[in-house]
A protein has these predicted regions:
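Non-catalytic, interaction-prone regions of core transcription and DNA-replication machinery
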Residues: 1-181
Length: 181
């Protein structure tokens, strides 16, 4: 029975170490550590830093940025999950090398938004993320050509219906005008 059950979400993240060893000078109670202990923790921290590979470092930087951007835009969890799948495939294909992680995070989120037909514009994402539109366009092009076919996802044009109602509400137009549009 236990084997038949399937987890609906990951319990622990699948990247990076489970514990972070920092260079500390005090213990949990705030007391000063001995010099030998401080040196030990400094060495352990240095070793741990060298054991993390480039993809894990990339994930460490990208995941909080994706969550922050999605929170600011009020995007549902299923879109964030798809965006993370897209971004992790981008990192696995090493498309981020020499390019902006922020631009790829923004492009991954926008691709996910387009896949799920969520009413957000690219200009909104770039404004909130404070990333240049040009770099996001480049990253989005790479994602559409290289990543989405691998994941089997379809990138569709924006359907105008959700945007009509959204902009009509912002402009305080009547329902009659909204239906006519």
């Amino acid at each position: 029975e236990v084997k038949q059950r399937r987890r609906t979400e990951p319990r622990l993240r699948s990247y990076g170490p489970r514990t972070v060893i920092s260079i500390v000078k005090t213990d949990a109670k705030g007391r000063q550590l001995a010099a030998k202990k401080q040196a030990l923790f400094a060495r352990l921290s240095k070793i741990q830093g060298s054991l993390i590979n480039s993809i894990e470092r990339n994930y460490w930087e990208a995941k909080p940025k994706l969550k922050a951007l999605a929170t600011k835009l009020n995007v549902p969890d299923y879109i964030i999950e798809t965006a993370w799948k897209i971004y992790s495939e981008v990192a696995k294909q090493k498309l981020t090398m020499g390019r902006s992680i922020e631009a790829f995070v923004c492009a991954s989120l926008y691709a996910s938004i387009r896949i799920h037909d969520f009413p957000r514009l690219l200009e909104e994402l770039t404004e909130v993320a404070m990333v240049q539109l040009r770099s996001v366009h480049r990253s989005l092009g790479l994602i559409v050509r290289s990543v989405l076919p691998v994941l089997g996802l379809k990138y569709r044009p924006i359907s105008p219906e959700p945007l009509i109602f959204r902009f009509a509400n912002e402009l305080s137009l009547t329902i009659k005008v909204q239906k006519e549009a």
